[in-house]
Amino acid sequence: MSMNYAELDEKTRGIMLSEFEFEEAGGTPYRSKALSSRGRQVFSQLMIDAIKHGTEVTLANALNDATLWEPMETYVRDGVSRERKRNIRQASERLALTEFSTWYVRGLARRLLDEGVKTCQVYRGAQPKWESGECSEHEGRIIDVKTIYDNHRARYWPEPGNKDAFSIPFGPSCHHVIKRV
């Protein structure tokens, strides 16, 4: 299912691209630790292609290549760390959703600031398979656009992040984005 990005037009895409390229040029752009060395090398171009002409769906399809991912992942169950083979399709969809939404929110927030808009509303762009209570509590909130812009990735990047920061998307697989009020 595709996300509903209310203002995903050429103007927003252009700002998304500018913001993405600025982070890339900063020397320490975010890269998922789940990506392989090759995945980290090609991710930037895949993201640029999605920003210019695609969506989270086209990005997920581009990422759905086992050579772009570390083959194993660690997870914790009942307090015990374990390893399992990575589900490439699931990992591709999760990263694509989170990254495309992150850049959409960043680009739209910049656009709204440039237009003098002070507040925005958090909304769910699509219905997730499961809803995190922590994420769901933000549905419908009216938020200061500058807070959204300033807290870009603040919960997790740069590491260790600020777990108390308010960021949209709130975390991996979050289906929340913003719109003008």
Question: What role is predicted for each listed range?
Answer:
Residues 1-170, 179-181:
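Domain-core detector
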